[in-house]
Structures are given as structure tokens and as C-alpha cells.
């Protein structure tokens, strides 16, 4: 069994779309998930465009050339310089605990260093222990907690 990661390409669009839909279906199980789903636009049929976007990096990963997960990070800027934020990282449920998520994070860290970014951020929902642990294993630690209240109810 060989774990791999590589940059995503237009030929990955169909599998990326399917994985994104699978990831979105689990958002409601976490506090803040439905709002995150509303705030973060679905790439959907636009994956072939997104993998060519210079402001974004998409990595795919899996086992023996079969894509089972992905990571999308978007460039941004802060006072100290250029950064990237991991907006989506997901591995299909049946392929978890093989190291695919760790490999995706490692690839994104290597990419960010190669791009001379000053930081790589990632987002995780409250209660999403798997994602939080994935980040922690890779050295990404909490630096900010966002709190909210629903003012419409």
C-alpha cells in the first residue's frame, strides 16, 4: 500500500467534486458546520478552474494512485506577509487512519515554505476532533478562537 500526494489537476475534477460533497454532508454534525457551509462557497463543478487558480493550491492524496482525499489552501496576506489558509481538508471515511491526511498537510507545509509564506493557517469546527488532531500532529496549533451568537433568534 503506497500513500501518495500530488498537486491536483483538471483531470481530478470529478473525484474532487464527489469528495467535496461527501465532506459537506458531514458539516451539520459539528457546531458551526451549517454556517461554515453557508460561508464557504461550494467549488462544485468549478474544480477544473480552481486547480488552475494561482491564489489556490489543491493537493490530492490517496493509496496506490486512487484519490481518496484532498486539501485546498488559499493565499492571503497579513501585516507580516503572505500566508495561506487551509479551507478544506478531507479524507473519505473508509480511508482514514492510513496517513493520507497527514501526507496532505505535510505537502501543504512544504508548498507554503517553498512559496516563502510566513504562515499556514487551517480551520476546524468545534467538536471536529479528527481535524484538530490532524493539524496538531503536523505542528499547526490554535492561535485564534472565533465565537459567535445568532442574533436572528
Regions found by a protein language model. Give the residues of each.
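Conserved GNAT acetyl-CoA-binding A-motif
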Residues: 112-124
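Conserved active-site alpha-helix within GNAT-family acetyltransferase domains
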Residues: 98, 102, 114, 126-144, ...
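Conserved GNAT-fold acetyl-CoA-binding loop/helix
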Residues: 21-46
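A conserved beta-turn-beta hairpin within the catalytic core of GNAT-like acetyltransferases
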Residues: 76-87, 96, 142-144
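Conserved N-terminal entry element of GNAT/NAT acetyltransferase domains
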Residues: 1-14, 29, 153
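Conserved beta-strand in the GNAT
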Residues: 60, 66-75, 85, 90
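A short helix-loop-beta-strand connector motif used in the catalytic cores of GNAT acetyltransferases and
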Residues: 45-60
Amino acid at each position: 500500500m503506497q500513500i501518495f500526494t500530488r498537486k491536483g489537476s483538471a483531470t481530478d475534477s470529478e473525484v474532487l467534486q464527489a469528495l467535496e460533497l461527501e465532506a459537506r454532508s458531514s458539516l451539520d454534525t459539528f457546531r458551526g458546520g451549517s454556517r461554515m457551509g453557508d460561508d464557504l462557497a461550494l467549488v462544485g463543478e468549478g474544480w477544473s478552474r480552481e486547480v488552475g487558480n494561482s491564489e489556490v493550491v489543491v493537493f490530492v492524496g490517496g493509496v496506490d494512485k486512487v484519490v481518496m482525499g484532498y486539501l485546498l489552501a488559499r493565499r492571503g496576506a497579513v501585516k507580516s506577509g503572505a500566508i495561506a489558509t487551509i479551507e478544506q481538508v478531507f479524507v473519505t471515511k473508509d480511508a482514514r487512519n492510513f496517513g493520507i491526511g497527514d501526507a496532505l498537510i505535510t505537502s501543504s507545509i512544504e508548498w507554503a515554505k517553498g512559496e516563502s509564506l510566513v504562515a499556514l493557517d487551517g480551520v476546524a469546527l468545534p467538536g471536529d476532533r479528527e481535524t484538530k488532531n490532524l493539524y496538531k500532529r503536523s505542528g499547526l496549533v490554535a492561535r485564534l478562537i472565533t465565537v459567535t451568537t445568532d442574533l436572528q433568534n
